[in-house]
Amino acid sequence: NYLKENNLIKNDKNYQKDITYDKNFFDSIDNEEKAYWLGFIMADGYTKLDKNNNPAQMSIEIGKKDIEILNAFKKSIKSNHIIRERSRTTVTGKISEICSITISSQHLTSKLISYGVIPNKTYIGFINEEIFNNNEELIFHYLRGYSDGDGTINKNKGNYVFKLVIKSKSILNTIVNWIKKYCNIDPKITIWEGAYRLSVQNKKDYFIFLEKLYKNANIYLDRKYQNYLSHINCAVPEEKP
């Protein structure tokens, strides 16, 4: 069995028969769904190689409270994969409920790797900009996926803040350049606990950026989108773009 030989399953109870999905889904990044999910996987997913260093598997793992987004991913790729749920103890001893989906596919995984979702990508992942062909709309669908994974949209003491936590310098540079190019905004960069924190917090800039992030959006993490809508509703006219 290919999965067992390459240590991609731990025991028989994890094995699922008659799996169906669109293995060619990521062959080209030419619409909202593909761009969004690529960004989301870059943030909250990972790829693995088999024992022969061939692309073998991709997974997405998130908090159980956001299980809706995994069901949306399954719908996009026409998948019948099981979403698995488990408890995990953090380094501080806190127990968190998580859910995950794993797809074993050399073809699909190799595509993700070519787009920058490389194994152990945390510090060395990159964004293959060529795949977007300078298409601004696709770029912001990708950024929305990435921010739904690793971003926050908050209002604190009257201040609006969009924040991304990024550990790869390459990914940071690409996203900063996009925000400067398409929004004419210079995001603030700080370093905290070994990671870069990119933030947009000037009120006018905040709404300019988020308006682009959610423009023509059909896929998004609803709780973050609702935060944005509540901020729009509370903002006074001069704060809006």
In which residue ranges do the predicted regions lie?
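Internal intein/HINT superfamily modules and their associated LAGLIDADG
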Residues: 1-241
